[in-house]
Amino acid sequence: ALVIARAFVEAAIARKAAKLRAEAVVMDAIAAAGDSPILELPMGMPFRAAIDRAGADHLLFVVHPRDTDWAITGIRRDPEGFALRADLPEAWAGLTDAAFAAASGVPGARFCHNGRFIAVAADRPAALQLAALAVQDAETVQQAR
């Protein structure tokens, strides 16, 4: 029983340590982003708590590498709901590959979810370009309100 209890405690400590390391990486990335509404992370990791803790309300999208491509993710307004600070452009919703690349004007654009909360690009330059276009679109949508 002691061995099992020890394993549970060690696992909990390891999870907490990993969470703290991830939060430190996100905090450094927030500092590096400055006033940019785009947060670039070195890998996929939990980011919401660090963004809240840093008071980084200006951030709209997170860009990070995945196994073979890059993701552009919207940031939720609050931890409880699904509403985003900014949606990806409506014109991209549900598009893939050539259709997405044509609609966005970005070679390497691969996929945008119908819900407009995540898009995928072939590489970092394409992901950053899509994120910049999404910010421009979000600003236009905001001004129209």
Predicted regions and their residues:
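C-terminal accessory domains and tails appended to enzymatic cores
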Residues: 1-145
